[in-house]
């Protein structure tokens, strides 16, 4: 019946709405003021990390049994979305903490969970995820990093590339070949610590966007780790990696969604103030049509992303398709919306005095990492509902 206030199918819960309000207030007060400097100086957003840790928002996905908030997948999406709305680099703190630690949550032993999830939940450590290599990007199963058993230890050698927050994170989930004759079924997952002998990092990449989040190579030179740091059974690492991405592609959708919303919000305010021909440019129909299209695309991306988050939380059988769809669609929307935001500001939008050019640069990576959007379409085609 029309008018029923209890029909919640397409509405987040009151608790989720309250969480969004709290994160937005925090992000605007503690993170937004530093976003331009973080980008300009290409420095890690320490202020954001401090604020997120102080409010237990840096890794809300960690289960309560390991000291975390035990937040659901939609709550994690809201945290990332609202932080990305003001600073995309900062949103990679909660996003990559989930990406790096989810293999442990999904497949790790109880001992591994207790050892590594507790410090993450407390804010004493961050997690990164090491899958890609110089010659193994979209073809991740073609990796060359090797792990060789030596008694009660594994010895790792290889190079991982494009590792987000490398050098800042204390813990790294590393995929390595343990049986080269089995291709993807010969890959295993391990937890490597920054302090392990033989671990080192390359120089930060000089990137178009997300400049505050360091992206580096991780070098593994005879890194000797205890055998109990293997995540799951030998040979299951690639399966764990792919299962992880089913869930975490949604966090990239959330990041893209936040970037797009931030760009729309800024452009909307600008066109109401900017006057030409004696009136605000918001009064011109051409401008209104652009804003309408931007808002429409964002809302469609939001519904797809939130629905995918719900499927992640439930573990629905079509999660692989829905996660890829959310990431692909939301990131394309982010690129379109931020480009339009720059256009709405005209020459001002093209300068660093205004945030929309940064948002446009930040948006581009969401179409690339955790699988390019071309790969997402392959994933979707192979998993059509």
Language-model features: locations:
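Short Gly/Pro-enriched turn/cap motifs at secondary-structure boundaries
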Residues: 95, 135-138, 162-165, 179-181, ...
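A short, Trp-centered hydrophobic/proline-enriched beta-strand micro-motif
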Residues: 123-131, 175
């Amino acid at each position: 019946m029309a008018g029923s206030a209890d029909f919640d199918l397409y509405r987040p819960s009151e608790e989720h709405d309250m969480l969004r309000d709290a994160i937005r207030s925090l992000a605007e007060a503690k993170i937004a003021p530093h976003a331009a400097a973080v980008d300009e100086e290409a420095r890690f957003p320490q202020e954001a990390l401090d604020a997120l840790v102080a409010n237990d928002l840096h890794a809300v996905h960690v289960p309560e049994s390991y000291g975390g908030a035990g937040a659901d997948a939609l709550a994690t999406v809201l945290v990332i979305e609202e932080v990305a709305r003001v600073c995309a680099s900062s949103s990679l703190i909660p996003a990559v903490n989930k990406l790096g630690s989810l293999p442990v949550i999904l497949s790790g032993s109880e001992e591994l969970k207790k050892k590594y999830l507790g410090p993450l939940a407390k804010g004493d450590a961050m997690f990164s995820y090491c899958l890609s290599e110089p010659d193994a990007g979209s073809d991740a199963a073609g990796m060359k990093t090797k792990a060789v058993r030596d008694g009660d230890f594994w010895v790792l050698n290889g190079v991982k590339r494009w590792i987000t927050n490398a050098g800042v994170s204390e813990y790294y989930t590393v995929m390595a070949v343990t049986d080269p004759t089995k291709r993807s079924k010969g890959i295993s997952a391990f937890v490597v610590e920054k302090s392990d002998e033989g671990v080192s990092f390359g120089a930060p990449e000089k990137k178009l966007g997300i400049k505050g989040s360091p992206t580096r190579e991780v070098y593994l030179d005879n890194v000797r780790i205890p055998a109990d740091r293997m995540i799951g059974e030998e040979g299951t690492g690639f399966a764990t990696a792919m299962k992880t991405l089913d869930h975490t592609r949604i966090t990239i959708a959330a990041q893209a969604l936040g970037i797009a919303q931030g760009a729309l919000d800024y452009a909307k305010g600008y066109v109401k103030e900017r006057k030409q021909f004696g009136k605000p440019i918001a009064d011109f129909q051409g401008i209104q049509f652009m804003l309408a299209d931007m808002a429409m695309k964002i809302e469609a991306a939001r519904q797809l992303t939130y629905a995918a988050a719900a499927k992640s939380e439930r573990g629905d059988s079509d999660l692989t398709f829905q996660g890829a769809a959310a990431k692909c669609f939301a990131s394309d929307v982010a690129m379109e919306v931020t480009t339009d935001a720059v256009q709405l500001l005209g020459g001002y939008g093209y300068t660093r005095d205004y945030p929309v050019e940064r948002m446009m640069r930040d948006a581009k990576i969401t179409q690339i990492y955790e699988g390019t959007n071309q790969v997402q379409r392959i994933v979707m085609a192979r998993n059509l509902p």
